[in-house]
Amino acid sequence: MARYLHTMYRITDPEKSRAFYEALGLEFRRELPIVRDGELEATNYFFGVPGQEEELELTFNHDGRTYDLGTGYGHVAIGVDDLDGTRARLKDAGIEPEREPYSVREGGSRLCFVQDPDGYRIELIERGG
């Protein structure tokens, strides 16, 4: 049996990324320096939803190389209990949604999209009744 463990994104600013994902409600779990041949090559930062095993791994490469998101990436969805509260925390951190939250159908889920500091799109979903 397989199980889902993590998704990894490459980042350019660990402090900005940490502030963003903590404002989303993810908890910072650990930092893992990657050393090869005596040199610090990268640092991995792990985040997760409290009470869940799956993680988001953010990798910062210390050599300064840059990355292109490409055309194949769409988004990752994160469920939130209170979309308005999450949006307020993000706004306090200087992060605006791509557009105001909206419902897919009457009485259904509400959602909005935001981008992290590296341009990764995150869909925030508050499930409806």
Model-found features: residue ranges?
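Core segments of cupin and vicinal oxygen chelate
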Residues: A2, M8-E53
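Vicinal oxygen chelate
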Residues: R3, E31-I34, F46, I78, ...
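Eukaryotic phosphotyrosine signaling hubs
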Residues: Y4-H6, G72-V76
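Helix N-cap motif at beta-to-alpha junctions
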Residues: D13-P14, D81-D84
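Short amphipathic alpha-helices within nucleic acid-binding modules
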Residues: F20, L83-R89
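Exposed loop/turn and edge beta-strand positions of beta-sandwich/beta-sheet ligand-binding modules
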Residues: E41, G72, G108
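Generic beta-structure capping elements
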Residues: P50, L58-N61, R127
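Arg/Lys-rich, alpha-helical DNA-contact motif
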Residues: G51-L56, D68
